[in-house]
């Protein structure tokens, strides 16, 4: 029997693709609405939206995650469960040959044609195993930030797909929490150099010290304490964020607070495990991986005001999460790259969230809430000090009215930060400072943007007028910032033409300030 088979399909035809998959499923006849097939149905819908025209079936795949599940559980069955899987690779070019190797070679010469793969387990209840597919095509409405590039080898040819791994729980070796943890660990493995456990290993790590119900089969899922233990064992720093009291009704205030709390991690590309408890339903875990963009939000989320010298007209600060709608999730129960609405009856929503656990690295001692609060305080103190210099200097300069601002906080690798600065339209002297300044491996960045035009951020047409950098391995209460950059829009002189950088030496704490070009530049677009 040939290990490879080639199929041509009509782009956008979901029914045709579903019909192709049916013979590969252990239980034949995938029926719409059947919970066990809902993830696969939504996956088919996503593949169709990517414009798939060719499918390469690869048989007898030794999928490492299913092999681990098989060893731990399925090999113990009296009924013989196969050890190997089927894998389907998708391309947006039409196959022009019946010879699989010729098709593979042609597609390898057109690398952009590769859309990713879906692995099918040889079990009836939960057939969809390791899946990596490109995100949705509409980049201006879908910002999938927790992702990586994955290398795929097929018959000697190498392919690459950028996406977020997805897996359906098998409801035996692992439930929803294990599936979400697997997705996050697999996404972060190359970037962070940490372990990428199989679902069986995740269950073992999670139940090492605390056991509730049966460990195998683990149909009852995991509690928060078990989830955090699995993360700690995998080399991450568990950090539980409370979002809503269990039993408390979701309100506009709790949903807004949840969006504010989660957004900095999502914008940082950090996967976040969110625990949902819908009304009159069992708890469920999903993985937060990105967000959409609403150019015209119904209201703006306030970050507070900055009052300078007891002014009656404070500087208004709004939060960048105001424009974030919806969040995007991987939901092992329903499928990949799906929206998480704010509040919707009969569907998982942000209002159902009671807590969240970001996959923070071990060297991050300052969380997002602390970083944002600290940077806002540093901004207020800096503007107050600069205002006093102008007021007490006797220069006769008019103190101007400050613009309304939007702040956005995220964690960023220093190499990524420097690359973004280098490619930006920031003034050269400010660029040179950031390129040569010592920075830790990762930094908290709080962007300072003008509210005017901020809705155009995805197009790079908004105006960034400064940023504050914070060392995540420091003590914010002791003033351990790295630098504060304020453009001319933030200086109190009515005719200010230059900006200022306040630089702090990370080793001895020495602080110096110097003038730099004061032009505006665009916020980061990931």
Where in the sequence are the language-model features?
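Catalytic-core signature of thiol
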Residues: 2-21, 156-158, 178, 188-249, ...
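Active-site-adjacent substructure of cysteine-protease-like catalytic cores
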Residues: 232-314, 322, 450-451
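Extended, H/D-rich, highly charged conserved domains that either
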Residues: 172, 177-180
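Second-shell loop/turn segments in exported
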Residues: 162-171, 215-217
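Active-site-adjacent bridging/hinge elements
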Residues: 144-161
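Noncatalytic regulatory segments and standalone regulatory/sensor domains
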Residues: 1-149, 291-526
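Active-site catalytic microenvironments for nucleophilic, acid-base chemistry
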Residues: 183, 187, 291-294
């Amino acid at each position: 029997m040939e290990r490879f088979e080639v199929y041509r399909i009509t782009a956008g035809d979901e029914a045709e693709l579903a019909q192709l998959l049916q013979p590969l499923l252990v239980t034949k006849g995938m029926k719409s609405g059947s919970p066990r097939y809902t993830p696969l149905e939504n996956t088919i819908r996503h593949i169709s939206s990517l414009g798939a025209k060719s499918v390469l079936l690869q048989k007898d795949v030794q999928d490492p995650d299913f092999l681990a599940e098989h060893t731990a559980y399925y090999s113990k069955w009296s009924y013989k469960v196969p050890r190997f899987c089927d894998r389907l690779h998708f391309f947006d070019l039409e196959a022009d040959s019946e010879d699989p190797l010729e098709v593979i070679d042609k597609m390898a010469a057109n690398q952009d044609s590769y859309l990713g793969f879906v692995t099918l387990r040889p079990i009836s209840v939960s057939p969809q195993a390791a899946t990596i597919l490109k995100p949705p095509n509409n980049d201006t409405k879908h910002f999938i930030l927790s992702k990586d590039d994955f290398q795929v080898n097929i018959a000697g040819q190498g392919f690459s797909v950028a996406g977020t791994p997805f897996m359906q729980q098998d409801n035996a070796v692992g439930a929803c929490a294990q599936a979400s943890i697997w997705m996050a660990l697999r996404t972060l493995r190359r970037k962070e150099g940490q372990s990428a456990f199989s679902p069986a290993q995740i269950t073992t790590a999670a139940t090492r010290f605390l056991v509730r119900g049966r460990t195998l089969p683990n149909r009852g899922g995991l509690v928060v304490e078990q989830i955090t233990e699995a993360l700690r064992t995998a080399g991450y720093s568990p950090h539980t964020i409370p979002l809503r009291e269990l039993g408390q009704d979701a309100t506009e205030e709790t949903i807004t607070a949840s969006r504010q709390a989660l957004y900095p991690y999502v914008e940082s590309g950090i996967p976040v495990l969110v625990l949902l408890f819908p009304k009159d339903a069992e708890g469920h875990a999903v993985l937060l991986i990105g967000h959409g963009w609403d150019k015209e939000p119904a209201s703006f989320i306030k970050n507070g005001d900055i009052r300078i010298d007891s002014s009656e007209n404070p500087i208004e600060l709004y939060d960048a999460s105001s424009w974030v709608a919806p969040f995007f999730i991987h939901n092992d129960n329903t499928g990949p790259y799906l929206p998480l609405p704010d509040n919707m009856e009969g569907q998982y929503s942000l209002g159902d969230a009671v807590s969240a656990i970001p996959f923070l690295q071990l060297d991050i001692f300052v969380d997002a809430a602390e970083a944002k609060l600290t940077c806002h305080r540093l901004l207020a103190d800096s503007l107050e000090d600069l205002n006093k210099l102008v007021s007490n200097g006797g220069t006769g300069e008019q103190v101007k009215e400050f613009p309304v601002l939007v702040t956005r906080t995220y964690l960023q690798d220093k190499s990524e930060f420097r690359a973004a600065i280098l490619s930006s339209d920031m003034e050269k002297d400010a660029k040179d400072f950031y390129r040569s300044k010592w920075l830790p491996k990762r930094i908290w960045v709080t962007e300072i943007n003008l509210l005017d035009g901020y809705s155009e951020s995805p197009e790079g047409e908004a105006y960034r007028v400064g940023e504050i950098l914070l060392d995540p391995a420091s003590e914010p209460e002791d003033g351990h910032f790295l630098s504060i950059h304020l453009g001319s829009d933030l200086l109190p002189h009515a005719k200010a033409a230059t900006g200022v950088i306040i630089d702090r030496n990370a080793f001895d704490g020495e602080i110096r300030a110097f003038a730099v070009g004061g032009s505006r530049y665009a916020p980061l677009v990931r």
